Curated annotation (Swiss-Prot):
Family of this protein: Belongs to the class-I aminoacyl-tRNA synthetase family. IleS type 2 subfamily.
CDD domains: Anticodon_Ia_Ile_ABEc, IleRS_core
Swiss-Prot/TrEMBL GO biological process terms: isoleucyl-tRNA aminoacylation
SUPFAM superfamilies (alphabetical): Anticodon-binding domain of a subclass of class I aminoacyl-tRNA synthetases, Nucleotidylyl transferase, ValRS/IleRS/LeuRS editing domain
Pfam family, one: Anticodon_1
Protein name: Isoleucine--tRNA ligase
InterPro entries: aa-tRNA-synth_I_CS, aa-tRNA-synth_Ia, Anticodon_Ile_ABEc, Ile-tRNA-ligase, Ile-tRNA-ligase_type2, M/V/L/I-tRNA-synth_anticd-bd, Rossmann-like_a/b/a_fold, tRNAsynth_Ia_anticodon-bd
Record organism: Wolbachia pipientis wMel
Length: 1111
């Protein structure tokens, strides 16, 4: 009995079991650990793994990011780089606190403080790692290699100390400051947010607001109305009526033209236009017809001219009498005027209630007059600050009015709009209310609308070094590359100072201590635990609140010895912590000072251009004056088939673990790595997983089939194959060259961070291996003698696997590992092997054979179109190309002047000599035709059609298009020199340049197909005679015998006895005519027709015949 050197494989394995076996093998043999430790520390590839939160299960976005990270980390490992993959956990911040509040059944600052900050933070510490073990299961099952045992957590004391160090460094460089400014504020979380947090996923969404137009009564009229004893009012528009109680100023535009309209609610009214009325009409004594006390009694409204049309429309719809004063005012006519406060809450505010010119006022929305509340708008804040108007912000941390607004105290701002509008109506200040739909920022954690309010906060002075960030960004290789100067580059150019403090509980504390007595000011900033222990004389085991808040000491600058240094109550924005990850994860600079480097590669979802990528860039530039990473993939989003986000509410996705158990990890990995989602596009994933199943069927199964074919026949022959690169056979040399070309192309793609292209190359390669090399070499494997030719065929497959499995390993780590181990190569694991070194290959041979394959595919597509089975031989085929013998007969290509030289089978420079007949035989055998005819003239078989590029020609000669179309229809065109087209006749003609036209090949026969980008045509002769019919039937009989062998579970090498039972005379004739052929193809010892069937025979019925076999 022949020895078996390879595993017995089955054609349809349980891929799920195979994957689990490989994962178990990796874990038991510590393959991942070895892949790191066996690489030199002097040859590192630095990879940053952005930390996720562990208070929720992984979703498809996490899996996608993980697949990308793992693929390129594995690839670099195979390039002999040391790639450490330390996993990290984001532990602090709003996600953790919101989760803890929900679990504890409490909400808001007051309830947390009542519950106890110590107990609350203890709960956060536990709950934030709630799903860490589940995460490990998911990550391991997706075949991603990471170091969980040496993980880092942003709540670790060592990590937090490095964050404190970073803050101290920035402070010492003058890049950190404290200030009261208007910031985005989440009243639901009771904390400010940074400006980039308002640009995260769907932070801006549609919101319907009540916009109100309000009349502000001037205490002194503009110069144009000094002599008029009527009230002048400025109309201002706002989408936040709840901010009106805090109004302290009005802003107008420097270059805006303003107009005045008189409103007379009780007088008889005649509508007039701006052009038809004179100024005297408006100012005349007849304009005082309304009774005293009316809210609109002869009042003059002033607003931007651009608002006049809207004003008139509203007035007419609501029967409000009005007249245009036909007086134009400039900003300077209004600037400096004082006006009556809408409400009395802050009527005594210093320098307030005046009109100011501001650059930001436009006419796009509203009235050209902007209501200004410095406590609730950034531009408002700076305008009032420049005029020494104090800031008023009468709301508490939960977004409710304080006692300063007495009749609204305790009312949430968004619930106060109707009350404010009612009060405005009651006092005659209201003009109109409208529904206004606009995009409005929402909290990224609670989905509640944000407000803008003044808050004290610590800031990183990003504006001081943002130009340097723009410079450093030019060094980064972004995928897709438009991110560099587009989404990310533009964001850097418009960067603001970054608010990094949060008035929350669970986070790294801001390491600032201040004197509690303003008479003896002092600020201490700490950058290490050692400094804290030195000054406060205490051993520090935990840096979290509330312990850190208990550290106090006497103010050294206070001679009275009474004031105390106390820590500011804020903690860091968790984005500051994640931006510190590159150095904080290794406790830099307290440890590993020599190790810290910029990342060679990172990847995350594209929105991180305004999140993690940005914070990394800010801190790396400010602290180290260098870019934080060199290569960055910004991937897209996984959506459902309707383009909706995957969500539990919509129930539009399957649990990833269910997908792994149904289709395996490799299939999902390959689907994601091969799609446009890698370069910023989106992936539509159906809940049933059909697209994943297709990968299993069309990618992984073909790879397995080639391996199964090898082991099945190699074990049958008892051969132990070898890696060998030199062969005599054309098809062997082609397959080896094709493999080396694929390996080189995959490496180039992976070097360019294009897994999408690498996956395409892999698919194309296995198409060639299965459907060209193996299929064309079947008879070599089937023959009984183990000669050199057969040995070469085994060695080719074994060699091809040796190279391509290593190239494919980062993309399909599980199936490649299984096959690698089955083929028993030297290295224990394919992932411990090095990526294949580039080998020389015969590019001309590849070009020839690829075109042969293309000719065959074109011919086979004709058969498929007309349902002509491949087993049915045809009489002949015609191949048209430029030269009669250049491609298959070995002569160099040459242009025949009489013919248009665009139709060709091979590119110029490809020559065939001794091997030409072999190519012809391949084509005839593959297409199953008896003869092949090469022609170099179109006459009788095809014609050329001219197709004009109208978009291009329309720009050059737009008035001649109709004439050109006419000449084309009349066939008045020919090719001239330099690939130009002469179109027309002697009286009128035009030269059509290359690119302005396309020549299409159209065959006379319907049994035809073009190939090689319209450079050649194949025509099949489909007429059948008796001889061809009989041969086709004989081939069908062979197929049915082989199918019966498979059904009987006979081995491929088993010799068999065959009995055919049929009443069809044609089938009998075919068997008798092709008797020896059928026996040879089926390894039949005997072949009988309609004889007695013994008891040991296995029988199967088919249409028109039955097949019985015995071994």
């Amino acid at each position: 009995m022949k020895s078996k050197h390879y595993p017995d494989t089955v054609s349809s394995p349980d891929f799920l079991s195979l994957e689990k076996e490989i994962i178990k093998f990796w874990q038991e043999n510590k393959v991942f650990e070895r892949s790191v430790e066996e690489r030199s520390k002097d040859n590192c590839f630095v990879f940053y793994d952005g930390p996720p939160f562990a208070n929720g299960l992984p979703h498809y976005g996490h899996l996608l990011t993980g697949f990308i990270k793992d693929a390129f980390a594995r690839y670099q490992t195979m390039l002999q780089k040391r790639v450490e993959r330390r996993f990290g956990w984001d532990c602090h911040g709003l996600p953790a606190e919101m989760g803890a509040e929900k679990e504890l059944g409490i909400s808001g600052r007051t309830e947390i403080e009542k519950f106890g900050i110590d107990k609350f933070n203890d709960h956060c510490r536990t709950s934030v790692m709630k799903f860490s073990s589940e995460w490990e299961k998911y990550v391991n099952r997706q075949a991603r290699w990471v170091d969980f045992h040496n993980d880092y957590k942003t709540m670790d004391k060592s990590f937090m100390e490095s964050v404190m160090w970073a803050f101290k460094q920035l402070y010492d460089k003058g890049l950190v400051y404290e200030s009261v400014r208007v910031v985005p504020y989440s009243w639901a979380c009771e904390t400010p947010l940074s400006n980039f947090e308002t640009r995260l996923d769907n932070a801006y969404r549609e919101k319907v607001s009540k916009a109100v137009t309000v009349a502000f009564e001037l205490l002194e009229n503009p110069q144009q109305f000094k002599s008029v004893k009527r009230k002048c009012k400025l109309l201002a528009w706002t989408t936040t009526p709840w901010t009106l109680p805090s109004n302290l100023a009005l802003a107008i535009g420097k270059d805006i033209k303003y107009c005045a309209v008189s409103v007379h609610p009780l007088m008889s009214f005649q509508r007039v236009t701006l052009e038809s009325i004179s100024g005297s009409q408006c100012l005349g004594t007849g304009m005082t017809g309304s009774s005293e006390g009316s809210s609109m009694n002869g009042e003059i409204y002033i607003f931007a001219e651009s608002y006049l049309e809207k004003f008139i429309s509203h007035s007419e719809q609501n029967n409000i009498p009005y007249e245009n004063c036909n007086i134009k005012l400039k900003a300077n006519d209004l600037a400096g005027l004082s006006y009556k406060p809408l409400f009395d809450y802050f009527k005594d505010t210093k320098n307030a209630f005046r009109v100011f010119i501001a650059d930001y006022v436009t006419e796009e929305d509203g009235t050209g007059v902007v209501h200004t509340a410095p406590g609730f708008g950034e531009e408002d804040f700076y305008l009032c600050q420049s005029h020494d108007i104090p800031v008023i912000c009468p709301i508490d941390n939960s977004g409710k009015f304080t006692a300063e607004v007495s009749d609204l105290a305790g009312v949430h701002v968004f619930d106060a709009n109707d009350t404010v509008i009612k009060k405005l109506k009651g006092q005659g200040s209201w003009f109109k209310t409208e529904q206004y739909i606009h995009n409005y920022p929402h909290c990224w954690r609670t989905d509640t609308p944000l407000i803008y309010r003044t808050m004290p906060s610590w800031y990183v002075a990003v504006t001081k070094f943002k130009s340097r960030m723009v410079e450093l960004n030019k060094r980064v290789n972004w995928i897709p590359n438009h991110i560099r100067d587009g989404q990310f580059g533009k964001w850097l150019e418009g960067a603001h100072d970054w608010s990094i403090s949060r008035n929350r509980f669970w986070g790294t504390p801001i390491p600032v201590w201040k004197s509690d007595d303003a008479r003896y000011p002092r600020v201490d900033v700490y950058g290490s635990i050692e400094e804290l222990e030195r000054d406060f004389n205490v051993k520090i085991d935990d840096l979290h609140r509330p312990f850190i808040d208990t550290l106090t000491r006497l103010n050294p600058d206070d001679p009275t010895g009474k004031s105390v240094m106390r820590r500011v109550p804020d903690v860091f924005d968790c984005w500051f912590e994640s931006g510190s990850m590159p150095f904080a994860q290794i406790h830099y600079p307290f440890e590993n000072k020599e190790w810290f480097e910029s990342a060679d590669f990172i990847t995350e979802y594209i929105a991180q251009t305004r999140g993690w990528f940005y914070t990394l860039f800010v801190l790396s530039t400010a602290l180290f004056n260098r870019e934080p990473f060199k290569n960055c993939i910004c991937h897209g989003v996984v959506l459902d088939v309707k383009g909706q986000k995957l969500s539990k509410r919509l129930n539009n996705y399957a649990d990833p673990m269910e997908v792994f158990d149904r289709y395996g990890s490799d299939a999902l990995r390959f689907l994601m790595l091969s799609g446009s989602i890698i370069c910023g596009g989106n992936l539509l994933l159906d809940k049933e997983g059909n697209s994943i199943r297709d990968v299993l069927k069309n990618v992984i199964k073909p790879i397995w089939n080639s391996y199964h074919f090898f082991t099945m026949y190699a074990n049958a022959d008892g051969i132990k194959a070898e890696v060998c690169k030199d062969y005599q056979s054309t098809i062997d040399r082609y397959m080896i060259s094709k493999c080396f070309e694929a390996v080189e192309s995959i490496q180039a793609s992976m070097n360019s961070y294009s897994s999408q292209e690498a996956c395409k190359i892999l698919i194309d390669f296995f198409e060639v291996l299965n459907n060209w090399y193996i299929r064309r070499s079947r008879e070599r494997f089937w023959k009984s003698d183990l000669d050199q030719d057969k040995t070469d065929a085994y060695n080719v497959l074994y060699t091809v696997f040796y190279y391509i499995l290593r190239a494919a390993a980062p993309l399909l780590p599980l199936i490649t590992e299984n096959i690698w181990q089955g083929l028993k190569y030297e290295e224990t694991s394919v992932h411990l092997a090095n990526f294949p070194q580039l080998e020389k290959f015969d590019s001309q041979l590849i070009a020839k054979m690829d075109l042969v394959r293309e000719v065959c595919n074109s011919a086979l597509s004709i058969r498929n179109t007309f349902n002509i089975r491949i087993r049915q031989p045809l009489g002949s085929m015609i191949i048209y190309h430029q030269s009669s013998c250049s491609f298959l007969e070995g002569e160099p290509l040459s242009v025949i002047p009489e013919f248009f030289p665009v139709i060709q089978v091979a590119d110029t420079g490809i020559q065939c000599a001794a091997d030409s007949n072999e190519y012809q035989e391949m084509i005839k055998d593959e297409v199953n035709v008896k003869s092949l005819e090469l022609v170099n003239r179109l006459e009788g078989i095809a014609s050329l059609e001219l197709k004009l590029n109208f978009p291009l020609l329309g720009k050059r000669i737009p008035d001649k298009i109709k004439k050109l179309v006419q000449y084309v229809k009349e066939g008045k065109w020919k090719q001239v020199e330099n690939e130009q087209i002469f179109l027309g006749d002697e009286s009128e003609n035009y030269i059509i340049e290359k690119g302005e036209y396309e020549l299409l090949l159209k065959a006379n026969s319907e049994y035809s197909s073009v190939f090689d980008n319209n450079k050649g045509i194949v025509i099949l002769n489909t007429e059948l005679n008796d001889e061809l019919i009989l041969e086709g039937l004989a081939r069908d009989v062979v197929r049915l015998i082989q199918e019966t062998r498979k059904q009987a579970d006979f081995h491929i090498s088993d010799r068999i006895r065959v009995i055919i039972k049929t009443e069809e005379e044609k089938i009998k004739e075919a068997i008798n005519t092709w008797f020896e052929y059928i026996k040879e193809q089926t390894l039949a010892l005997s072949l009988d027709i309609n004889t007695e069937i013994g008891t040991n025979f296995y029988s199967k019925e088919y249409q028109d015949l039955s097949v019985s076999i015995e071994r």
